[in-house]
Amino acid sequence: MRRKCTDSLIYWKKNPGRKPLILQGLRQTGKTWLLMDFGNKQYEHTLYINLETDRSATDYLSVPHDPQEVLLFLETCAGKPLRPASSLLILDNIQCIPQISTLLTSIALDFPQYHIASIYKGVVNSDSFSVHDFDILTLYPLDFEEFLWANAEFALTREIRNHFSDFSSMGKKLHEKALSQFRLYLLSLIHI
């Protein structure tokens, strides 16, 4: 499956001025899946830690530590090597640790070569996270075009885009197919 936000993640990875990433968005929009898929395709190693379920990580990170010690701890927790530029560290549910902003900022200042992405359930509070210290992306629910991609309706996607761009009408059969897919899309939204 492809999400439009993936292009922004690739840009983030390649950006030499990259800051720790916060992927924010509503529940059940695919934030964890997106970062795991991105990590598995773009990096040698993807380290994932869920701060909502990993009590030892949450307890450890809730107390101030030296950034290098934190990186070693997270590497041990994830059970995979954390290497500059070839590993992606994903911290899920960072809203569970109120002072995580300070910790991530310290790591980024001391070790900018590490790629750190985090997942925030909801919308980041600007009082807790400085927009100058983080790259923040928002993942929205699947849109209709992404739904068509997920269902391998590439030709239909292209036709809709072409007719929209040209301000031209679709043929009846094509329009019926587009409406049928749109109804399925609306039903999928109900089940989120």
Feature locations, PLM:
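Phosphate-binding site recognition
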Residues: 1-190
